[in-house]
């Protein structure tokens, strides 16, 4: 895949080699792409980076990463991060991407959504402390900003909007906020090297098919040449990222991010309404946008935010620039998923 090759070049340019990566949430959208980049870069640039892909299901990991199983630079580990991380693992970098990340999971597994982020992250930070890990990247989210108070257009890293904490849906956002605070506590008490990535809404071909986010459902409609189903008026205005840009940004944060700092990550020309997102896919697929009412489970998982645009000046000041055009990335995502599902 050309995008993996492009981001692999970033890895080579940053001269990240002979390092051991422990990737939590390896089977997720970002984790899968990140691992593909590391393995491709090993093959092309002989970087000799080692990958430990961590998830809750060994069988799922074996299925996803079957092409890497025989590679000496790759291994998998079945771990529940809500328990102590096994001490026999060794790594230089940790990427904490383990979390429920879509609305249906927030509604049907609300406790797991919270514990994986808070208890799981603490277990990972304890492991990082014991093992004297070089750097941990914590995957946070645009959702920590809450609702825009209509006093600003873009969220910079100092902004804090409103979250009604006395709701089921607050679990994900508040868990991410608490996990960020936990990172700061470990930095203060144990001098851990942690960098926080506040990532916008992400799309890409490595998404899990069970993901219930509106953007993923639109893409799956496009993959199956179906009318695109919109379950609201579609006025919500959000920043999005193609997964290739997210991984490129994470690589830069591993190399150049400042300890203890948080960085917004969003894609190129990617501030669009939900309706625009749906129309882009319908136009490409030559279908229509249809409005349907959500069911009760879907309603419980929906974000209450209506405007969530990220200011990405801070990470750009480190030298990062998004590479992938929004519409082209949507089209590539659909075509790659079609090939994988129907070939």
Where are the predicted features?
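Amphipathic terminal alpha-helices
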Residues: 1-15, 36, 46-49, 326-343
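N-terminal Rossmann NAD(P)H-binding glycine-rich loop of SDR-like oxidoreductase domains
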Residues: 20-40
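NAD(P)H-binding glycine-rich loop region in Rossmannoid oxidoreductase-like domains
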Residues: 78-116
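Conserved Rossmann-fold NAD(P)-dependent oxidoreductase catalytic core, especially the SDR/UDP-sugar
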Residues: 96, 122-169
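Conserved beta-loop-beta element that borders a ligand/cofactor-binding pocket
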Residues: 141, 180-205, 216
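Glycine/proline-rich active-site loop of Rossmann-fold NAD(P)-dependent oxidoreductases
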Residues: 149, 177, 203-217, 226, ...
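Conserved C-terminal active-site "lid" loop/helix of NAD(P)H-dependent oxidoreductases
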Residues: 243, 276, 298-321
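Mid/C-terminal beta-alpha module of Rossmann-like enzyme folds, strongest
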Residues: 256-299
């Amino acid at each position: 895949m050309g995008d993996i090759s492009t981001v692999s070049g970033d890895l080579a340019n940053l001269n990240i080699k002979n390092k051991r990566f422990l990737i939590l949430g390896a089977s997720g959208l970002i984790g899968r792409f990140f691992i593909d980049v590391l393995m491709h870069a090993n093959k092309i640039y002989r970087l000799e980076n080692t990958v430990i892909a961590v998830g809750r299901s060994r069988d799922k990991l074996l299925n996803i990463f079957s092409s890497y199983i025989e590679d000496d630079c790759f291994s998998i580990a079945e771990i529940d991060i809500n328990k102590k991380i096994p001490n026999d693992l060794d790594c230089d970098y940790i990427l904490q991407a383990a979390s429920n990340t879509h609305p249906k999971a927030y509604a049907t597994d609300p406790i797991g959504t919270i514990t994986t982020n808070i208890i799981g992250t603490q277990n990972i930070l304890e492991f990082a402390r014991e093992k004297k890990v070089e750097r941990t990247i914590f995957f946070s989210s645009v959702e920590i900003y809450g609702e825009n108070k209509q006093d600003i257009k873009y969220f910079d890293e100092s902004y804090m909007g409103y979250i009604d904490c006395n709701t089921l849906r607050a679990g994900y956002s508040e868990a991410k906020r608490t996990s960020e605070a936990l990172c700061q506590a470990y930095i203060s008490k144990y001098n851990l090297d942690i960098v926080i990535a506040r990532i916008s809404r992400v799309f890409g071909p490595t998404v899990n098919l069970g993901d219930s986010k509106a953007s993923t459902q639109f893409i799956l409609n496009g993959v199956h040449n179906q009318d695109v189903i919109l379950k609201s008026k579609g006025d919500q205005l959000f920043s999005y990222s193609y997964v290739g840009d997210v991984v490129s940004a994470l690589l830069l944060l591993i190399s150049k991010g400042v300890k203890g700092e948080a960085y917004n990550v969003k894609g190129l020309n990617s501030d669009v309404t939900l309706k625009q997102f749906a129309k882009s896919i319908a136009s490409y697929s030559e279908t229509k946008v249809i409005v349907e009412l959500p069911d009760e489970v879907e309603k419980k998982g929906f974000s209450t935010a209506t405007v969530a645009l990220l200011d990405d000046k801070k990470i750009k000041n480190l030298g990062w620039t998004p590479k992938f055009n929004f519409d082209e990335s949507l089209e590539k995502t659909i075509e790659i998923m079609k090939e994988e599902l129907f070939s």
